[in-house]
Amino acid sequence: MIETLTNFFITSALVLFGIAFIIGLFRLIKGPTTADRVVAFDASSAVIMCIIGIVSVIYNTVSFLDSIMLVAIISFVSSVSISRFIGGGRVFNGTNKRNH
């Protein structure tokens, strides 16, 4: 009984996260502004991390946790880079001094 409920909830979570990913992907492609695309990319990468976590639970392994960490790092670095580009127009300024 409990295993049936667990399978139902895991399957439902995968379906709902899949729908959320499709919606985020649509906003990523169709977003009118760059800020919309950045938010959609962050949301999509969070959904991907959740899907990988659920797949890790299904297969009863911790091997997928490294890929969750990799997706999180790539998402963070890309969000910071795009935010700096939107804010000032340059991602790297070529000097070691910070502008305060």
UniProtKB/Swiss-Prot annotation:
Localization per record: Cell membrane
Family as reported in the entry's similarity comment: Belongs to the CPA3 antiporters (TC 2.A.63) subunit F family.
Protein name: Putative antiporter subunit mnhF2
Subunit-structure text: May form a heterooligomeric complex that consists of seven subunits: mnhA2, mnhB2, mnhC2, mnhD2, mnhE2, mnhF2 and mnhG2.
Record membrane topology: Multi-pass membrane protein
Record-level Gene Ontology MF annotations: sodium:proton antiporter activity
Pfam families hit by this protein: MrpF_PhaF
Any Gene Ontology CC annotation: plasma membrane
Keyword list, A-Z: Antiport, Cell membrane, Ion transport, Membrane, Transmembrane, Transmembrane helix, Transport
InterPro entries: MrpF/PhaF-like
PANTHER family: NA(+)/H(+) ANTIPORTER SUBUNIT F1, NA(+)_H(+) ANTIPORTER SUBUNIT F
Principal location listed in the UniProt entry: membrane
Species this protein is from: Staphylococcus haemolyticus (strain JCSC1435)
UniProt gene name: mnhF2
Transmembrane parts of this sequence: 6-26, 38-58, 62-82
